[in-house]
Swiss-Prot record:
GO terms for molecular function: metallopeptidase activity; tripeptide aminopeptidase activity; zinc ion binding. One of its GO terms (cellular component) is cytosol. It comes from Streptococcus pyogenes serotype M2 (strain MGAS10270). One of its GO terms (biological process) is proteolysis. The active site is at 84, 177 (proton acceptor). This is Peptidase T. Binds 2 Zn(2+) ions per subunit. The keyword Plastid does not apply. Zn(2+) 1 binds at residues 82, 143, 200. Its cofactor is Zn(2+). It catalyses: Release of the N-terminal residue from a tripeptide. It is found in: Cytoplasm. It comes from the Bacteria. Transmembrane segments: none annotated.
Length: 407
């Protein structure tokens, strides 16, 4: 179905810079996310008919309720999307609208960048559709402002059509998903539902209930700096220690070599001097045993290097971030079966594959609310080549409406 306000709503949202900050110690991590919640989303939620709309300054969540208008529909369903965008320029987002895409290259604004079907064959899935792209200087922010726009549009449709019967609906827009801490302070007591969905997936049909298990790894290397002219048998180069550590990890177990259910080690940052260096990694895997084995491996590498050095110069700090939500959701597949049924009735083929990433639903599922993930439309997310199809967004709205009417 077409929805009059969906595109304008999405464009309005993405023009607001809500980039999160991994180095911040506040919640939300950036003031712009709170401002976006309070000045744009909250008034709009109230205007379209959501009740008890409130912002929690402790966890950064904006929550609203649409009560059931049919007492026989007893389920309570939640929909969640995140307000922040990834670690890429989000200032002065200037979306391009490509009507009736006919294939071929899409030049991104006046930049030297283009969307090329040879580099991005997923473009070929969108012939004849309306695409929203960047101008080549920023990301788009469809991850996850497409999800926010879809939830808002579904609620607006339901409140404008009171004859359409639906169950109790809860809506939550949260912060800092992209830096892995968005759901850390989520309050289940403030979101009383039987199950929920994050609208944070990619192409049409995605329905996901398996995520990575994730850990953050920080490794500090302590060197000993002396003049290079007299360094023989004295200097210990911390940067070289970092290189040695990295080379001891399996070379083919990196993101660029893995897919499907394969896990990886990913070096995300490396800084330092001869005296001290620091390497940042993320560790990902699906199965609990292999996830734990990866963490043991880095500990063993550090221990081996320290033994060879004769002192503790490789310091490892490991922190689990989230876990594969399959462990929770497979105990009660109601949310998955309902979503599959609704999609099939809408002639959408459910694409059930693992998420090679995580969502807020991972943590929320372990808090007691099964929260699988549904497509929101974004492609090539987290960079200048991001785009989204308006038609896919419309279908996501259809799914939301179908879920609450069938509950």
């Amino acid at each position: 179905m077409k929805y009059d306000n969906l595109l304008d709503r999405f464009i309005k949202y993405v023009k607001v810079n809500t980039r999160s900050d991994p180095d911040s110690e506040t919640t939300p991590s950036t003031e712009s996310q709170e401002a976006f919640a309070l000045t744009i989303l909250k008034p709009e939620m109230e205007a379209i008919g959501l009740q008890d709309v409130h912002y929690n300054p402790v966890n950064g969540y904006l929550i609203g309720t649409l009560p059931a208008n049919n007492p026989t529909l007893t389920r309570k369903i939640g929909f969640i999307a995140h307000m922040d965008t990834a670690d890429f320029n989000a200032e002065n987002v200037n979306p391009q609208i490509i009507d009736n895409y006919q294939g071929g290259d899409i030049t991104l604004g006046s930049s030297n960048y283009k969307l090329d079907p040879k580099a991005f064959p997923n473009l070929n899935n969108y012939i004849g559709q309306t695409l929203i792209t960047t101008d080549g200087t920023t990301l788009l922010g469809a991850d996850d402002k497409s999800g926010i726009a879809e939830i808002m549009t579904a609620i607006e449709f339901l409140t404008s059509q009171p004859q359409i019967e639906h169950c109790d609906i809860k809506v939550a827009f949260g912060p800092d998903e992209e830096i892995g801490v968005g759901a850390d302070k989520f309050e289940v007591a403030d979101f009383e539902v039987d199950f929920a969905y994050t609208m944070d997936g990619g192409p049409l049909g995605e329905l996901q209930y398996e995520t990575f298990s994730a850990a953050a790894l920080e490794v500090t290397f302590l060197g000993r700096n002396v003049h290079p002219g007299t360094a023989k048998d004295q200097m210990i180069n911390a940067l070289q220690l970092a290189i040695d550590f990295h080379e001891k990890l399996p070379a083919k177990e990196r993101p660029e070599y893995t897919d499907g259910y394969q896990g990886f080690y990913h070096l995300t940052g490396l800084t330092g001097t001869v005296e001290e260096a620091r390497a940042s990694y993320i560790i990902r895997d699906f199965e609990e045993a292999s996830f734990e084995a990866r963490k043991v491996k880095v500990e063993n590498i550090a221990q081996s290097m320290n033994a060879q050095l004769g002192t503790k110069r490789v310091l490892v700090e490991l922190n689990d971030q989230y876990y594969n939500m399959k462990k929770v959701i497979e105990k009660d597949m109601t949310a998955i079966e309902l979503a599959k049924e609704v999609m099939e009735e809408l002639a959408i083929k459910p694409v059930i594959e693992p998420i090679r990433g995580g969502t807020d639903g991972s943590k929320i599922s372990f808090m007691g609310i099964p929260t699988p993930n549904i497509f929101a439309g974004g492609e090539n997310m987290h960079g200048r080549f991001e785009f989204v199809s308006l038609q896919t967004m419309e279908r996501a709205v259809d799914v939301i409406i179908g879920l609450v009417c069938k509950a």
